[in-house]
Amino acid sequence: METVTVVLNVATQHVEAFEAGFRNHELPVWHDLKDRGLLVGATLNRLDISSRPVEGSVQYLVAVIFSTGEGHHAHDGHPGFEAWNRIADAYQVGQPLAFGGETVLQLGIPAD
């Protein structure tokens, strides 16, 4: 398994559009990858706690668990994600933070 997380800083005036766009564009990508056995689980989280807040933004944590590294590459090359990524860039202020790597321990997530 591989876990990838990204912290996005969405301008406060774009929060509704960002969340609606995420549902309309990224969620179908997640469903596609899950149906293909590449994605184990994923969440979009509005952050209430942050050690690196960005003024004028609402921060979101995107957390995705892929069955293998192949899933991560399939996600990033997915036409739906590529289109959404271009749209979502316009909503952001500040630089996103991205982290990822092999999942060492997990609980409550089926390991196919």
For the regions a language model picked out, list residue spans one by one.
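N-terminal non-cleavable signal-anchor helices
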Residues: 5-8, 16, 105
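Short amphipathic alpha-helical segments
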Residues: 14-44
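Short, flexible helix/strand-to-coil boundary loops that buttress conserved ligand/catalytic motifs
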Residues: 19-22, 75-76, 85-88
